[in-house]
């Protein structure tokens, strides 16, 4: 139904208008009594081979929702009901900001890709805190992707402010230093700058742990796919030196190699199918560089169970999707979940953790 009816209708709309319509509809469904439970019956059945415990939380599926789709955390119950094993909200900044001028989101259907230059549009950390506080009992871990406001000169203070505001509603923090749409942000990936920033964030999580006596959420960092190999290695090492607890590989790319659609010249970060191979190779690099010391989360061009499995075998403990959800529809997480179980069975692997890094 999605491909035949809903997708053609949505693709007649401006990409951002369709985005808002979809998220608002899911937010409404999240508030309907009984709807999430009913939708959950349509998702893939639980599979103990895919269940993992990471950072003290249970992940019933390794397939999560990447940041950017539900920036303000308004539809977490709906995304959980669709079968995602975790949901990453944001990117959130301390203060609300409108982001860049529209149009700023573009579909490239022949390339199964998106280009965005959103610019961290969001309602701010206080609003997100209120939204997540109202969730009640959660069925999946909720990660919070944090960034800096566009006009902030001292970046660390914004990341620390997000931790202070959201500490008790986040199951994990993701430090976003790799969006190409905030001036100067990617410079924070340089080894020394990244290590200093992550130390500031980790110091704040420790301070909050002591203040609240609540277990500190893990801190992960999200890296870009456009770094030179030596710079990527230095960034990974800087993150490890700081004590980060996970890596997300990778964010959107500035590359336009192989694109055919007219929108290929639009400024912004490219996501979707063109990143499949590149991001998988970077997951493998990250796994080798860390020697499996911290979990790696693979994201970029995952359209099927085969794509997800390739990233897992390259070294990803978890994977995330976003652009493919736009093209494949709400049944995608359940299809990937079922397919991963079949692939493990095919390869005679008893649990997904035993597949992590098998090809690294």
UniProtKB/Swiss-Prot annotation:
It catalyses: (S)-dihydroorotate + a quinone = orotate + a quinol. One of its GO terms (molecular function) is dihydroorotate dehydrogenase (quinone) activity. Its cofactor is FMN. It is found in: Cell membrane. Pfam families: DHO_dh. GO terms for cellular component: cytoplasm; plasma membrane. Its main location: membrane. The keyword DNA repair does not apply. Keywords: Cell membrane, Flavoprotein, FMN, Membrane, Oxidoreductase, Pyrimidine biosynthesis. Catalyzes the conversion of dihydroorotate to orotate with quinone as electron acceptor. This is Dihydroorotate dehydrogenase (quinone). The lineage of its organism: Bacteria, Thermotogati, Deinococcota, Deinococci, Deinococcales.
